[in-house]
C-alpha cells in the first residue's frame, strides 16, 4: 500500500483507500488506529449492515472522525518519505467485539464534516463499482474473453459491453427492489 500511495501522491492522483492495518505516524507516537480513537466524533451516521453468509443484518451507529496525518515509511522502506494524507474514520459505537471500523485514507482535503461525509459516501459506493466490473468483465458480458485483433474494435466493443453491463446491473437492482416490496 505504501508504494501505491507514494505513486499516487507523486503523480498528483486522487485516491480513497481503506487502511486494513494500523500504520505508524510521523507526528504521533501512537499508530493510526489509536490516533483515530482519540479524535473527537464530529457526526453520527446510521447504517444498516445487510445479511451476508452467516451474519445477520443489523443497524449500527457510527462515529465519524477526521484529521490530517503523515504516514511513516515502513522500516524496510527507508528510502521513502512520509506520505501526508487525510484520515476519515467511521467507527461503530458500543462494546461489541466485532465492531465495524472503516479507516479511510484520502488525498482529498477534509476541512469539515461535509467533506468527511462525502468521502464516506465514495467508500459506500465501492460495491456498486465492484458489481459493475464483475458484470462487465465476467458474469454478464464476459468482455475478458474477447479475442479481437484490432485495438479500435476492442475499444468499441468494450464500450458497447459496458452499456450492456450497466443495463444488466440496473435489472438486477430492480429485481432486488421488487423482491423487497
Q: What do these predicted regions represent?
A:
Residues 1-181:
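Single, function-defining residue in the core of a domain
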Amino acid at each position: 500500500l505504501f508504494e501505491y500511495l507514494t505513486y499516487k501522491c507523486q503523480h498528483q492522483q486522487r485516491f480513497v483507500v481503506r487502511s486494513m492495518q494500523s500504520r505508524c505516524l510521523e507526528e504521533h507516537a501512537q499508530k493510526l488506529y489509536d490516533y483515530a480513537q482519540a479524535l473527537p466524533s464530529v457526526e453520527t451516521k446510521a447504517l444498516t449492515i445487510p445479511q451476508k453468509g452467516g451474519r445477520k443484518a443489523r443497524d449500527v451507529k457510527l462515529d465519524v472522525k477526521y484529521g490530517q496525518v503523515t504516514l511513516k515509511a515502513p522500516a524496510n522502506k527507508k528510502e521513502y518519505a512520509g506520505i501526508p494524507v487525510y484520515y476519515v474514520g467511521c467507527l461503530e459505537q458500543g462494546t461489541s467485539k466485532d465492531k465495524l471500523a472503516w479507516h479511510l485514507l484520502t488525498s482529498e482535503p477534509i476541512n469539515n464534516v461535509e467533506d468527511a461525509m462525502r468521502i464516506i459516501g465514495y467508500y459506500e459506493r465501492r460495491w456498486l463499482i465492484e458489481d459493475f466490473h464483475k458484470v462487465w468483465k465476467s458474469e454478464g458480458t464476459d468482455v475478458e474473453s474477447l479475442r479481437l485483433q484490432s485495438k479500435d474494435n476492442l475499444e468499441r466493443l468494450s464500450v458497447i459491453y459496458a452499456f450492456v453491463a450497466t443495463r444488466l446491473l440496473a435489472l438486477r437492482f430492480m429485481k432486488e427492489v421488487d423482491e423487497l416490496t
